[in-house]
Curated annotation (Swiss-Prot):
Domain Protein kinase: 109-417
Taxonomic source organism: Mycosarcoma maydis (Corn smut fungus)
Described function: Protein kinase that is necessary for a-locus-dependent processes, such as conjugation tube formation, filament formation, and maintenance of filamentous growth, and for a-locus-independent processes, such as tumor induction and teliospore germination.
EC number(s) given by UniProt: 2.7.12.2
Stretches the record annotates as Disordered: 1-61, 307-359
Descriptive protein name: Dual specificity protein kinase FUZ7
Family in the record: Belongs to the protein kinase superfamily. STE Ser/Thr protein kinase family. MAP kinase kinase subfamily.
Gene label: FUZ7
Length: 435
């Protein structure tokens, strides 16, 4: 049971060191063709689309960085640390004008429009004038030594090895002192977070295609490259003009994770119970985040949107107590901390201490939310409103014991994903309906 003391220990973990993947011996190399799924979300082929995208001079015709590394895995029975040391050395030998090697320079990128901004950086739609390629440029605000920024660039180069219809394509990265600029595939239809907030809850049929894309994408990242995403949430799942669904912003760079100041606040709302309690991050933590995301998209609101105050403020919410009872199992939980009337009044006056939850104007302090995730039953879809296999899928994702929770690869074999993968859903029409 978390207590106020536990809250103090949680805050001490905000240096994010624990978010880095442990460098343990890696499994034998996995053939990318064995893990890349045969079915693709949408009528068009993501692979054929990728072939039309302008490639940089540092990328081979097959789309991979010209390095003697197969599928991002060490081909010798050495440790993960040895693999990363070798890769870093190989990338260091490329000459440190990474932007020149990738033919990406700030002066060659013409800004077309602003796509978004936050504490961590900005995203703009740009035109690479030399190739005529439209890209999304993400500028990450980093307060770090030049040597750390260069190390981040080296770590990001493994993204050139990621080749999947479920992963947003990466064109390259360069320094624009003091920040890091990353250029990626432009996804015309926004993130799932922006889509459901504008158009309302997403249908079970589309949610099925989302489950297919994310489970296969996470499987590819981990099985082929030993990458754990670490930040699965609707705002990191994007849709392009053909209705294809792809994941982005995965944790390939440990230095980048450590350098972004708001990482803890940004990811904690989707964090698994074991991660909140300080355990090592694993690929099963991504599965928990996927389960929370599917509920959020299907209901059109964040599933943990529970008020920290008493019921007299319920009239201000955009959902009812009956709605809450359907998503918080088994019923609307009692407050985690018993508060006296004076304390309730004090909390009302100190409202800015709370955070606005995804998909809701509702506020709950980060500590209260973390206590809720650890101590209360996990959220669930309202019984009877969604397909049975969808309910079962979400319940498996949200098993609180990580030993019982499936891996992304296990999810790809679940009947919900198999059925959704085979279902004829016009994703192009879905995308066309979003103006």
């Amino acid at each position: 049971m978390l207590s106020s003391g536990a809250g103090s220990s949680i805050r001490k973990k905000r240096n994010f060191k624990g978010l880095q993947l442990a460098e343990s011996p890696l499994a034998s190399p996995v053939d990318a063709s064995a893990t890349t799924p045969s079915h693709k979300p949408g009528e068009g082929s993501a692979a054929s689309n990728a072939s039309t995208i302008g490639k940089s001079s540092a990328v081979t015709p097959g789309g991979s960085l010209a390095l003697p590394v197969k599928n991002g895995l060490d081909t010798e029975p050495n440790s993960g640390a040895n693999y990363h040391n070798k890769l870093t050395q190989q990338l260091a030998n490329l000459e440190l004008g990474v932007e020149y090697k990738l033919d990406l320079k700030n002066e060659d990128l013409k800004t077309l429009s602003e796509l978004g901004a936050g504490n961590g950086g900005t995203v703009t739609k740009v035109l690479h004038e030399k190739s005529g390629t439209v890209m999304a440029k993400k500028v990450v605000f980093i307060d770090a030594k030049p040597s750390v920024r260069k190390q981040i660039l080296r770590e990001l180069q493994i993204l050139h090895e990621c080749n999947s219809p479920y992963i947003v394509s990466f064109y390259g990265a360069y320094l624009n002192e003091p920040h890091i600029c990353m250029c990626m595939e432009f996804m015309q239809k926004d993130s799932l977070d922006g889509i459901y907030k504008k158009y309302g809850p997403i249908s079970p049929e589309i949610c099925g295609k989302i489950a297919v894309a994310v489970s296969h994408g996470l499987t590819y990242l981990y099985d082929v490259h030993r990458i754990i995403h670490r930040d699965v949430k609707p705002s990191n799942i994007l849709v392009n003009g053909a209705g294809q669904i792809k994941i982005c912003d995965f944790g390939v760079s440990g230095e980048l994770i450590n350098s972004i100041a708001d990482t803890f606040v940004g990811t904690s709302t989707y964090m698994s119970p074991e991660r909140i309690q300080g355990d090592q991050y694993s690929v099963k933590s991504d599965v928990w985040s996927l389960g929370v995301s599917i509920i959020e998209l299907a209901l059109g609101r964040f599933p943990f949107a529970e008020n920290e105050e008493d019921d007299d403020s319920d009239a201000d919410n955009n959902y009812t107590n009956e709605d809450l009872a359907g998503t918080l199992s088994p019923t609307k939980p009692a407050p985690m901390i018993s508060l006296g009337q004076n304390e309730k009044q004090r909390r009302r006056k100190s409202k800015p201490a709370g955070v606005s939850l995804e998909g809701s104007s509702h506020q709950m302090s980060i500590l209260d939310l973390l206590q809720h995730i650890v101590n209360e039953p996990p959220p669930k879809l309202p019984e009877g409103r969604f397909p049975k296999h969808m309910e079962e899928f979400v319940n498996l994702c949200l098993l609180k014991d990580p030993a019982k929770r499936p891996t992304p690869k296990d999810l790809t074999k679940h009947q919900y994903v198999i059925d959704a993968d085979a279902a004829k859903v016009d994703l192009q029409a879905w995308a066309d309906g979003m103006k």
